[in-house]
Amino acid sequence: MEVILLEKVANLGNLGDKVKVRAGYGRNFLVPYGKAVPATKANVEQFEARRAELEKSAAEKLSAAQARAEAINGKEVTIVAKSGDEGKLFGSVGTKDIADAVTALGVEVEKSEVRLPEGALRNTGEYEVDVQMHTDVTATVKVIVVGE
């Protein structure tokens, strides 16, 4: 299935690229989420007519993401959680907890933007956590988990 990308998609291409993807990926993810349209003649013509508008909105999203990233990059957030004697938490600190703590700093962050490659934090200590605001923009936040 060939699609035209309406925004930059990681590991696939940039705005306006015509790429060949598996039918299920195109039908079930790219098209419903507004990231692409099927590459029919009508859609190609319509895309070329709207290209400048789409590029402008993509540039605005990128600059907004960069501004948000600069506001939180290098900041520290402290999260208090119940823990045992050896620093092991009862439960864990997940993406929602980190997103809420960063949002309390004054920058709106969704839990889907927080990247925890090793999974939820289960011990007390200091962690470097990436917050991916945009495909090209990532900020690093220092998360300090303190036992209660």
Swiss-Prot record:
GO terms for molecular function: rRNA binding; structural constituent of ribosome. Pfam families: Ribosomal_L9_C, Ribosomal_L9_N. One of its GO terms (cellular component) is ribosome. It comes from the Bacteria. GO terms for biological process: translation. Gene3D superfamilies: Ribosomal protein L9, C-terminal domain, Ribosomal protein L9, N-terminal domain. Binds to the 23S rRNA. This is Large ribosomal subunit protein bL9.
